[in-house]
Amino acid sequence: VIGGDECNINEHRFLVALYHSRSRTFLCGGTLINQEWVLTAAHCDRFFMYIRLGMHNKNVNFDDEQRRSPKEKYFFRCSNNFTKWDKDIMLIRLDSPVNNSAHIAPLSLPSNPPSVGSVCRVMGWGQTTSPQEDLSDVPRCANINLFNFTVCRAAYPWLPATSRVLCAGDMEGGIDTCNRDSGGPLICNGQFQGIVSKGQNLCAQPRKPALYTKVFDHLDWIQSIIAGNKTVTCPP
């Protein structure tokens, strides 16, 4: 996160870190949505990966930190009216459930769609500078604004006219999610509304908000898979 501050140690109990299990490199963020499931971005997927839960500083292990491997992964395969930008979402089932603890607790799915103009919270261990690849050892948090989708269409003319993505950032620049913040949450008015997906190659540029997969528009799919329906019908 660019332009943020170190997150309060108690404000990100649902934030998880995805790692490559062979190189041990940090890949992405993710969000614990119940004891057994993590929601992240599809572009974070790697064949070999593990998940750290209850982590703050990458180099310090809390007593209650837990590690899990993916048992199952689900991707949004719908084709009707969905573009590739609408599909940057992945559900990971953990190989065993995690227990709530001082540094681990899930974040519930949204009960309402987000409203344009909301102030939203982003967090992650990603780049703190751009284009230099300075990663953070601790998660950084920042507040950004939720814009009408047309703002992102003006910034990225290749975007389709309608999309199940959210557009959020700081129009003046200087505050943004960046590389390796991918997969982490966008929290608007206390609700988990977006997944960090894509932005400009140079992060935190003026008038270039980032794109976030809209969690609310994928709720039926998420809830069906968690309920055990593996052949989920696509939304209309």
Curated annotation (Swiss-Prot):
InterPro entries: Peptidase_S1_PA, Peptidase_S1_PA_chymotrypsin, Peptidase_S1A, Trypsin_dom, TRYPSIN_HIS
Post-translational modification remark: N-glycosylated by units composed of Fuc, Man, GlcNAc, Gal and NeuAC residues.
GO molecular function: serine-type endopeptidase activity; toxin activity
Glycosylation sites: N81, N99, N148, N229
Enzyme class name: hydrolase
Regulation of its activity: Inhibited by 4-(2-aminoethyl)-benzensulfonyl fluoride. Not inhibited by antithrombin-III.
Origin superkingdom: Eukaryota
SUPFAM superfamilies for the chain: Trypsin-like serine proteases (SSF50494)
Residues making up the signal peptide according to the UniProt record: none
GO cellular component: extracellular region; secretory granule
Protein known as: Thrombin-like enzyme kangshuanmei
Annotated organism of origin: Gloydius brevicauda
